[in-house]
Amino acid sequence: MSPQTETKTGFGFKAGVKDYRLNYYTPEYDTKDTDILAAFRMTPQPGVPPEEAGAAVAAESSTGTWTTVWTDGLTSLDRYKGRCYDIEPVAGEENQYIAYVAYPLDLFEEGSVTNMFTSIVGNVFGFKALRALRLEDLRIPPAYSKTFQGPPHGIQAERDKLNKYGRPLLGCTIKPKLGLSAKNYGRAVYECLRGGLDFTKDDENVNSQPFMRWRDRFLFVAEALFKSQAETGEVKGHYLNATAGTCEEMMKRAIFARELGAPIVMHDYLTGGFTANTSLAHYCRDNGLLLHIHRAMHAVIDRQRNHGMHFRVLAKALRMSGGDHVHAGTVVGKLEGEREVTLGFVDSLRDDYIEKDRSRGIYFTQDWVSMPGVFPVASGGIHVWHMPALTEIFGDDSVLQFGGGTLGHPWGNAPGAVANRVASEACVQARNEGRDLAREGNEIIREASKWSPELAAACEVWKEIKFEFETIDTL
C-alpha cells in the first residue's frame, strides 16, 4: 500500500490513507477462546510486504476500509477489529504465505453462517493488493457454535431411526440423472431398495423439470419406498430433493415429503444458499426428517489451491448450518480428493474434538462440544472393487453411494444392489475378523463373489475401471 499520508483537521481527526499494518498487524496479540480464527493462504502482489497483505485481509474482512474515516472515533476499533497475529511462508511456494487472523465474536450474528461468510470471505477476495487469496481453515469457538442448531439429528439418532448399526450405509443415485418419467424413476428406486440398498437419491439437478414434476416424483418414490420396506423388513429412504427457486417452494416440497411419510429430504446447500439450508434444517429437526446435503458447485469454490476456500471450511459451515449427510469425495473414485486431506475434514464432520494436524490440513484444534456429527458421503465413480478401500478409509459411520456402480450392473438394478450389499458385508465381516482390507481387499471380494453370482458379474464388468489422475488440491 501507499506510505502514510495524512491531513490534520481542526477537530483532531487525521484524514488520509494509512498502511493497514499500522492498526491490523498485531504479532503480539494473544488469541482469545472466543475468537473466530482463520488461516488464509495469500499471494501478495509484487512489492506488497506480507505483513501489509495480512493486515489488509484482517482489515477488509472486519472493520477497515481504504482510508481513515472520522466515524472511527465513534466506536472502539480495538474491540471490533480483526487482527493478523501471525504470518508464515508456505514451504515450496514462492511469494505465498499463511496469514492467521483473529476475529472478535461480536462481529458476527448468532446462528448465521451467511453473516459469518459475508465478512470473512466477502469483498476482501477481490482486493487488488492480493494476486490470490484462499481460506484454508476456520476455528469456530464453542461460544459461537453453540448458537447454531447444527445437524437436524446426527449420526447416532439417524442409526436409531433406521435401526442399522455396525456397517456403512449404502446408497445409489438414480441414473440417468435427467430424462426419466416419474413412474420409471419410481421403478428404478424400488428395484435398488429391494436389492439391499438403504437409500436411493435424486441427483443434485433433479428439481421439477417438464419431464418429471416434483410432486409426481415424490408420489411414485413414496410408493416404491413402502413396497420395498414391506418386502425386505428394513427401513428404506430416498433423498427427495427439495431444492427450489424460492425458499417458500423448497419448504412446500419438504412439507409434502413429510406428509407422505418419507424419512429424508435433500438440499443442494451451496446453490440453494446457507439461509435456505438453515431454514430447512430447522424444519427437519422439528418434524423428524433426515436431511441429505449435496455440495454441487463446491469445486468452483474449492478446487484451486491458491484462491477460493477449502472444502474443510465448507464442511464446517455445513455442520453449523445443518445436515445429516454431506458429500465428501471418495479418495478412490472419479472426483477430487487426497486421502489425508479428505480424512481431515471427514473427522471435522463426525468427531466432537479434532486436534490440530497440519499433515492433514487441520490448522486449528476444533471443539464442537455437543453438536451432532454428520455422515460423510462417498460418491462418484465407485464400484464393488472399491468397497474394501472405502470401508477401510471411511469406516462404519459413512454412506457409500454407488450410482453407475449399481445401475450399470449387466443384470439390472436389483442385482447391482445385491452385489454392493454382499461386497459391503463381506468387507465388514473380514475387518471384524482382523483381516487387512488395504492388503487383502481384492481377495476378500473374490471370495465373496464365489457364492454371489450378482457380485461375480459386477466384478467382471468393472475389473479394469480406474480413475488415476493426480490430485490438484494438495497440501
Swiss-Prot record:
It is found in: Plastid, Chloroplast. GO terms for molecular function: magnesium ion binding; monooxygenase activity; ribulose-bisphosphate carboxylase activity. The active site is at 175 (proton acceptor), 294 (proton acceptor). It comes from the Eukaryota. Keywords: Acetylation, Calvin cycle, Carbon dioxide fixation, Chloroplast, Disulfide bond, Lyase, Magnesium, Metal-binding, Methylation, Monooxygenase, Oxidoreductase, Photorespiration, Photosynthesis, Plastid. The disulfide bond which can form in the large chain dimeric partners within the hexadecamer appears to be associated with oxidative stress and protein turnover. PANTHER family: RIBULOSE BISPHOSPHATE CARBOXYLASE, RIBULOSE BISPHOSPHATE CARBOXYLASE LARGE CHAIN. HAMAP family: RuBisCO_L_type1. Belongs to the RuBisCO large chain family. Type I subfamily. This is Ribulose bisphosphate carboxylase large chain.
